[in-house]
């Protein structure tokens, strides 16, 4: 973690104290003029509304006005530049007259500190983030610098800013890269990774600007709910969240629960069930025992399969009240593991462990695991020792985590396509930012084939043809298995290709940096979130002109994703900052997005001599399939949000109660009222300070115990709530009713249990106090993310898996 150091001679405290005393260095504001260059096309404004156009025009005018102050900023030495930044009045960003001066200072500080002089479009992007929007900036247009300038604007106004990244690598890289810029404006910078100690984290969060991954921030929030002393709090302050790759964090991973678990003595899932299902699946008559739906996303026992399982388990009735919520659930989970989850598609096996693949990023989800029974079932399927499950002590979804912040803004290359989700679930606007240099990338229409086999043959031929010219090719595949199959095909054609997939993600930055090298062929799984620019001619741009002459980077997509955003992220790798480039997608009527969303009987089948569909409607049909898939994703998000929202509200109540107990004398006062005789007895031998600590530990323990039990109860409900639909009950309504009823007595039960402990705990003989050894907290804790959608694709498709509301 970078230490938080203020600029020499100007302490952080003094800087903020001076901000309300007037602006000694404030320059006169000249009459602003409307910016004429880089105007956005009218179709964006029709989409986003007149209010957005008005706000964007104001920001454009402020960027133009900032040029009037560039010379004054350039004439200031480093010390005066820091002082000028500290004296700006940016507390009310909406009405501040100092915005043009701030932009001039930021531009000058950027050039001095990093060698990067921000373009007008980067300043515009920063202003739209300061207005609370998510901006869409194309790949290579400088989002990192724009984000740092926006963070500086918030911090100079007295706000604490968390720049939220998608992984630790980017958090550290961007913090170290942008720290000189922020420090040049008298701001402190910190960063956090999984290796950061508690002291490192506290120091980083005390900085004006803190860079950290969404996982680490979430885990810090969860761990703070276990401490029994204020001094142990890491205390991330939820003030401003500036989110990089905002669509990935706020949409793709919005529903992912972050989990804090601890050691427990509860039983692990029964291996006999998992082994029984494995035998069932391998049986020569397996087709008689279970059935899958048309798109292989749900599986269930047939009547014959149920009878066979019941017989193997001693003649039980799977659908009886005794077994329907337990044994049947375990059977269904094991079926999903063996029938639907595919190795090298949904997960990989490395170092004797199962690693999930993040579908939206195409990389290993290092901290993710499936809901406990499914994780164990997959491990057993692969012959791997099942990992310790533990007990869930606390959990929070990414969406609930981000909604804690007072202000949320962000940046991504594909915000418009996620605009509806951003508006509906976060009340965020979207501001498209024009490129600094016009995009000249050429995007071909899809090449569509009847079968996947014909498509794959055509892809190899196309890559070979382009490779013969020396033009670099970047191929984006849907999953690991596809990338490795394509790689093998290319090698058989004597085409040397580099593979970047979830199996070698540690090398991804170096691999991607060289994808623009002359004659290079790079095969990669989903490109979202890579965070590394692809420069023509390689990372050193040695052959830039030669590659540009050949047409720049050529991007090949091996199939449409279920959302246009991911297609655009792949296309956006070509045509960086005005460079030439091109893209083409190959699709087939057998692709997932088509099979799940279009009627196969109504698809055109006429082909040319190369097997390519000749109908002009083909690309339009693919677009329609994507729109259907995106609509389903929005419905699923909304439905799942309704389940998670109640838990988030209940958690907020617990957090508020816990903070009261932790930071005040409430625990001592309440137990004194509830057990006055015991309190009087103890107060005669125990100091008030120690007695307060004892009372706090007792009350916190029972509150935490009650919350963990409540979460376990909710998990049990989720495993069988879908069965309520069979009785014509609304599962959501039933879940809410049961969750509310259970929560109603949680606080009172915790207080009652605390009173009993206070009155019955033995008095210590060797020192004043109570023996609290029975209030045993977990001997170890760990954090992870739950992949609550095991067949994760970009639609979050409906599943029958118990415990998943889809």
From Swiss-Prot:
Its EC number is 7.4.2.8. Its main location: membrane. Pfam families: P-loop_SecA, SecA_DEAD, SecA_PP_bind, SecA_SW. One of its GO terms (biological process) is protein targeting. One of its GO terms (molecular function) is protein-exporting ATPase activity. GO terms for cellular component: cell envelope Sec protein transport complex; cytosol; plasma membrane. It is a peripheral membrane protein. InterPro entries: Helicase_ATP-bd, Helicase_C-like, P-loop_NTPase, SecA, SecA_Actinobact-type, SecA_CS, SecA_DEAD, SecA_motor_DEAD. CDD domains: DEXDc_SecA, SF2_C_secA. It is an enzyme of class 7 (translocase). Belongs to the SecA family. Monomer and homodimer. Part of the essential Sec protein translocation apparatus which comprises SecA, SecYEG and auxiliary proteins SecDF. Other proteins may also be involved. This is Protein translocase subunit SecA 2. The gene is secA2.
